[in-house]
Amino acid sequence: MGKLSNIRRTKMLAQEGRCYYCGLLMWDPELKDAAPAICLAPAMQKYLRCTAEHLHPRSEGGANTSSNIVAACWYCNTRRHHRKAPPSPDVHRAHVQKRMAKGKWLAARLPSTVTVGGRASLSKESRLPC
């Protein structure tokens, strides 16, 4: 594992396995642990894969340092950078949270999403099967 992988994993653990932007549980393919039960469907595993999100993008001189990286799910990370001018992390986080509250972000793709402690999660009964 490289330095970036170690930082990503450390951040993921510090964030209790939750995406910096949407708060959904993520998984790390390099860990032996299975994807969280929040979603076992292969397509959702892609969306919820943990990535190292550079708060200050590398393309703009951002470094691979712990202070510049948070753990974010693939979906939130790619959506931030698909724009012509990616918004700041704070602006993107507010945007994601607003869309989540309206059921118009990744959580809308998951069945029976509920909010627990301000974070989206799924009830045991509504988790997708393998």
Describe the residue ranges of each PLM region.
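Short, charged surface segments at domain edges that flank catalytic/cofactor-binding sites
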Residues: 1-39
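The −1 position to Zn-ligating cysteines in a subset of zinc-ribbon hairpins
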Residues: 17-18, 51, 72
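Histidine-centered nuclease catalytic patch
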Residues: 26-69, 84
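Glycine-rich, phosphate-binding/catalytic loops in enzymes
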Residues: 36-38, 89-92
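Short Fe-S-cluster ligation motifs
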Residues: 47-66, 99-126
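Short Cys/His-centered divalent metal-binding micro-motifs
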Residues: 69-91
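Glycine-rich beta-alpha-beta "Rossmann" dinucleotide-binding loop(s) and their flanking helix/strand
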Residues: 95
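N-terminal pre-domain and mature-chain start segments
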Residues: 128-130
